[in-house]
């Protein structure tokens, strides 16, 4: 496993590589990146890098909501609300993106908000809704990071399962440029 950072963060932003039962479908995450079981995700030492008063922003698809809330708790946080709701738009044509979904056609994804201790919100004007085009598989809109900083302030922050360097953010993950060790298969 990739070595975890040794410092404390007041903001933790994560887009876990969830495993799904429907691995055989064309949209399966396993076609794009290595996924992790709930047990492996829950075993990550996230609580060790969380400051006494900190906030967790955790992406989850709707079939994963119960597991996502359980993961928030496993990492030492308390679920509070949906922090952000991403309404996916098409890149090449007007209108909304429609995925396959599980019961109904999927269009949106949520980023849950959990707290540890008593973190302070800096700006109460931050909107939950994000209307942005869907890009490559699982890539989230950059606007989310901006809204997190506006909401909470310029605090020590890390993105878990990061794929790119972003100014002001530390990163950790199998695809993060500074990580020289890949996750165990």
Model feature map: region roles:
Residues 1-185:
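Class I S-adenosyl-L-methionine-dependent methyltransferase catalytic core
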